[in-house]
Amino acid sequence: MLACVCAIPVFAQKDTTTVISYNIRLNTPNDGDNIWDNRKDCSVTMVKMERPDFLCVQEAYFVQLDYLDKNLPDYQYIGVGRDDGKHGGEHMAILYRKDRFEVVEHGDFWLSETPDVCSRGWDAACHRIVTWGYFRDKKTGKHLYCFNTHLDHVGEVARRESVKLITQRIKEIVKDKKAPIYLTGDFNSDISSDIFVPLKKVLKQARKDAPVTDNKGTYNGWGSAANIFVIDHIFYKNAKPVLFKTLDGNIYGRPLISDHYPIKGVFLN
């Protein structure tokens, strides 16, 4: 009897963690045919098809987050609105598979000179925030950290100082020095920017290190942008990336489910 040889990646048979960073594009009537109501089902389809352990979203208004919460029953989320620390403004929420993970500790801080209170920092055009969680794998008992953010699109000083603050806060928050750390977000900066110098001393780049990867752009501007802007990133530590993928395929119900493509990282634990 011949053995069946199946084309299943080796990592698919092992203990992995899948992380997706997704700028879902805020809910605004100015997007014409690309308004949230026309693509919200496609965002849900993407999550159900990709089945990430962690879905880290940016630009999510509460109405959008509430829709995801109600239509993705396998997930729970942490995160607050950046404009008031409650439901106001955009959320950098972390959705996690509740069958596999539980929250041990979580929090939020603002990217400003006064990070522990709702505030706008430096030359930023908007309030900016980081949501983070310390999670326990219910099956293995292992722990990990996940941080999610969105840097300012205008303030150059704000982006630079924000990366410094994030790097420092990760050092302060992470007590479990052996636990995997994931940092996701829309950084509004190419990885070649020198703003990342302090962060690269602490965390590594999933896109660069994964043996299966791509070099595709992540910002599409609803099709108007040249596919060269790589501004969404996944950083990590204490894990082994085996796959990085820009989810730009027309397989979720419409060609563009946001003005950013989701990015996906798969890591061996």
State each model region's role.
Residues 1-7:
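Bacterial N-terminal signal peptides
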Residues 11-71, 84-89, 164, 269:
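N-terminal, active-site-proximal structural segment of metallo-dependent hydrolase catalytic domains
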Residues 16-28, 92, 104-109, 142-152:
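Active-site-proximal beta-strand elements of phosphoester/diester hydrolases
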Residues 21-41, 87, 111-125, 152, ...:
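Acidic/histidine-rich helix-loop elements
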Residues 25, 61, 150-152, 187-190, ...:
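Catalytic metal-binding/acid-base residues of hydrolase active sites
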Residues 54-143, 246-248:
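Structured beta-strand-rich core segments of catalytic domains in phosphoester-bond hydrolases
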Residues 125-127, 138-160, 164:
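Metal-dependent phosphoester/phosphodiester hydrolase catalytic core
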Residues 157, 161, 168-181, 188-269:
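Metal-dependent phosphoester-hydrolase catalytic domains
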